[in-house]
């Protein structure tokens, strides 16, 4: 939103709260998007150049019916509907093109299933009713103000001179996108005429192993990393989980790999992301200004690491 305001756009946020802390230049609409009648009431008589649908309810999920409901309501009121999907919409697999099949309706993981179903619903609205839909599929997003304990997880431990847990053999692939590059490509998705009706993979062109990721975090902080490889089955057996409470590799960070190819976004949207190292350098500056100085409970990691450290 800050970027849209900076570019001179009139910006409105629609959410459940009666107010916000985004500044006086951002107007406020209060509604629960799950309540169609509320949406109808607050959107009545209003038109927008573009809608950015970025919200996902991690507690209850955001089903395709909710996304489709908003799309139907604004179909004749907007010239662009930009939906934030995810690399997870593919379900699994490596080196995906945009034309690859998305996760089916019976996919077991809710987030991936709902993102895939939402994309299918929006493109049906585009085909049948002319909704000017564009979808974006980013991988792991990193950068300042990340609400997930990810980059900070590693930097906290590196600064405390902790040994890091490396799940498995360290070769699991991860792919990233700096948040400022995501913002820039969202603006492009709003303005480029040829984007309508298309999905775009957006991320750094090269995937990285988890070993390389740890090395990059250490380099950004100017620290040396010490790691111990621990089999995933042992991590899970003693209570570790990617979503916590017993984290071992950041929040929701150690996941089966899904990677994508970004040639289409480069060609159509002029997508030019910064390197992972460049983005981490800026993110670390933010971290130094904002990180919490409270003590961290390392007892679970100590439990994981103890056998390996005793054997070494």
Give the residues covered by each predicted segment.
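Glycine-rich Rossmann NAD(P)(H)-binding loop
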Residues: 143, 167-172, 200-207, 218, ...
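Conserved SDR Rossmann-fold cofactor-binding beta-strand/turn motif
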Residues: 137-138
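NAD(P)H-binding glycine-rich loop region in Rossmannoid oxidoreductase-like domains
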Residues: 20-23, 27-77, 90
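Residues in the short beta-alpha loop(s) of Rossmann-like NAD(P)-binding domains
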Residues: 17, 87, 206
């Amino acid at each position: 939103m800050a970027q849209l305001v900076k570019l001179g756009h009139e910006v409105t946020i629609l959410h459940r709260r009666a107010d916000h802390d985004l500044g006086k230049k951002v107007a406020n609409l209060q509604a629960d998007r799950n309540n169609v009648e509320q949406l109808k009431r607050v959107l009545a008589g209003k038109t927008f150049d573009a809608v950015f649908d970025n919200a996902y309810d991690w507690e209850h999920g955001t089903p395709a019916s909710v996304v489709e409901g908003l799309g139907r309501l604004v179909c004749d009121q907007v010239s662009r509907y930009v939906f934030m999907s995810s690399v997870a919409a593919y379900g699994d697999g490596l080196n995906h093109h945009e034309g690859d099949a998305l996760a089916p309706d019976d996919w077991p993981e809710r987030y991936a299933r709902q993102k895939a179903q939402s994309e299918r619903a929006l493109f049906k609205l585009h085909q049948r009713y002319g909704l000017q839909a564009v979808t974006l599929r980013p991988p792991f997003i990193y950068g300042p103000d990340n609400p997930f304990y990810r980059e900070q997880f590693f930097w906290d431990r590196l600064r405390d001179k902790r040994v890091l847990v490396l799940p498995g053999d360290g070769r699991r692939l991860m792919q990233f996108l700096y948040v400022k590059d995501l913002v820039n490509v969202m603006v492009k998705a709003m303005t480029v005429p040829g984007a309508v009706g298309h999905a775009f993979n957006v991320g750094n062109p090269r995937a990285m192993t988890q070993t390389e990721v740890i090395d990059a975090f250490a380099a950004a902080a100017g620290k040396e990393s010490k790691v111990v490889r621990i089999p995933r089955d042992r991590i899970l057996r003693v209570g570790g989980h990617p979503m916590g409470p017993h984290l071992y590799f950041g929040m929701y960070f150690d996941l089966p790999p899904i990677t994508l190819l970004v040639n289409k976004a480069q060609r159509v949207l002029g997508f030019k992301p910064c390197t992972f190292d460049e983005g981490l350098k800026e993110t670390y500056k933010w971290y130094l200004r904002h990180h919490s100085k409270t003590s961290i409970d390392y007892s679970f990691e100590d439990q994981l690491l103890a056998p390996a450290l005793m054997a070494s």
